[in-house]
Amino acid sequence: MQKPYVFQEIPVHRPNTPLLDKIDSPAQLRLLNEAELLQLAHELRAFLLYSVGQSGGHFGAGLGVVELTVALHYAFNTPEDRLVWDVGHQAYPHKILTGRREQMLTIRQKDGLAAFPRREESPYDTFGVGHSSTSISAALGMAIAARLQNQPRKAIAVIGDGAMTAGMAFEALNHAADTKADLLVILNDNDMSISRNVGGLSNYFARLLASKTYNQMRDSGKRVLQGAPSLMELARKTEEHFKGMVAPGTLFEELGFNYIGPIDGHDLPRLVETLNNIKELNGPQFLHVVTKKGKGFAHAESDPIGYHAINKIEPKPKVQDTAKAPKKPRYSNIFGQWLCDMAEQDASLVGITPAMCEGSDLIEFSKRFPERYYDVAIAEQHAVTLAAGLACDGAKPVVAIYSTFLQRAYDQLIHDVAIQNLDVLFAIDRAGLVGEDGPTHAGSFDLTFLRCIPNMLIMAPSDEDETRKMLTTGYQYTGPAAVRYPRGNGPGADISPGLESLEIGKANLRRRGAQTVILNFGALLPAALGVAEESNFTVVDMRFIKPLDQNMILEMAGSHDLLVTLEENCILGGAGSGVIEFLASQGIAMPVLQLGLPDEFIEHGKPAELHKEVGLDAQGIANAIKKRLKSLNLASPKTGTSA
């Protein structure tokens, strides 16, 4: 086997890719011979390195599936055959080979290519993804649809070993076997977490298991032995024993799949041969390929976590989120430090995360308190109910989770935590617009779906110090509590070193002006204060979404002509809706302007670009207020004082 060339550095200049430059669709790829396919894989890896270096983006996963991507588009008739990528981090080579090569420098940028497969972007993107573990269910649906329509097309799901830890993946596997649909599930095992048994014998056996001859012989033998149950059982046990010597596929065989593998995911000729054999088979098939994340780039091979994604090269690559510490700490850093500090004070604290140790800044906690740290893998539902069980018996669980992923555990949040009024603190990271990853990762809805749950305490800090104090407040609260904070850095507020808490339901008057009051919920406070200084508005940092500071709202409503609510959450059902509901309950009718995320999915781009697009930057806020004041025939006052 020809081994992939290992790059030592990311190309700064566009590499010479004469073969790749001629490939604008997989149909052209299928005209190549074996030697040309190997050359194409090399050029594809070189171009992927170059393009991500120029734009920034997900890195290691795509490098690891170059050969698999080429083989899939060569063996199958895409897009007629449905190819579904799980999560989508590994789909960059797929995008390059399906007519988007020249657009790759725009990936994750405003109005450019999306970070993940999107149905709106290409017919080759058969299913939109971003969250994990959805591919098998989606591909199974496509396989069943093909059968209902009497169409011969194939359905293929490519899923990583990390995504296979989620319950949804096993739900789909269990159902797939029952349907007997023509579905191929490819396990991209890039951590060797299921098996290390890769070599000549297993490769040979994989080819045998995938061959049409073997499967015809097996089916014919079963028919012959149907009348002799004892011989049938002996044959079954012999086959299972043979497979068990070289393949770890017992689980998948028991689920009803024909298991094939493991095979080397970087052996392109072997992949093509195996896939060509598999596509002739009927029923659920399971192919286990072993790959190396970051394959072909030395630094990524040695540090696959650090090189999961990179920033744009300027002029040398910086590993995303692992470069020199910023002058101002990230909100996640504030949480990570608070968690360690609180754990030192309270031995009952337990930290839980669904596979977000690095992103949620739990690394230090996991090292210092390993017996109280639980990474449950990609299993958000389990994470929340695990926390509920801990809380039932005296532990104090803290669930560190991204806003977008908490959506996946909504029933557990209500049924297992809130109804029982259990002491669980949710540290909700990536609230609001997260930027380049787009709508699948935006934290646009948490205030809305949390606010309607009884017993919940909900807080949104405006700076670093409030974040720390709110975490303490939520931790000490009797019942479920949530602190939602954005991605990135805060404004640079001084942080109190202790473990102080806030008075529950108490807002903070930040600036006293006249006529118009901005009730701010969360991290948009600096923009609100800037607008208020220009126009002499009052600004209140509300802090608490539930319970609201009702006395503050009544005071502001009685002394101002226009009330503005500001939040980085969808307007529908958000914090502003809570203010309006309270005013209505008090029989107060007054002009209220709700500023927040519109009723649409916000596409990818830099956070500053997106804030401007939706009118949540300082200028957009000022313009919206000015427009409303004009409609009310009110003029802006010009003097005021900070509170």
UniProtKB/Swiss-Prot annotation:
Residues reported to bind Mg(2+): 161, 190
SUPFAM superfamilies documented for this protein: Thiamin diphosphate-binding fold (THDP-binding), TK C-terminal domain-like
Gene Ontology MF terms: 1-deoxy-D-xylulose-5-phosphate synthase activity; magnesium ion binding; thiamine pyrophosphate binding
Keyword Metal-binding: yes
GO terms classed as biological process: 1-deoxy-D-xylulose 5-phosphate biosynthetic process; isopentenyl diphosphate biosynthetic process, methylerythritol 4-phosphate pathway; terpenoid biosynthetic process; thiamine biosynthetic process
Entry's EC annotation: 2.2.1.7
Cofactor detail note: Binds 1 Mg(2+) ion per subunit.
Cofactor(s) needed: Mg(2+); thiamine diphosphate
HAMAP family documented for this protein: DXP_synth
General function of this protein: Catalyzes the acyloin condensation reaction between C atoms 2 and 3 of pyruvate and glyceraldehyde 3-phosphate to yield 1-deoxy-D-xylulose-5-phosphate (DXP).
Recorded family membership: Belongs to the transketolase family. DXPS subfamily.
Protein name from the UniProt record: 1-deoxy-D-xylulose-5-phosphate synthase
Organism: Hahella chejuensis (strain KCTC 2396)
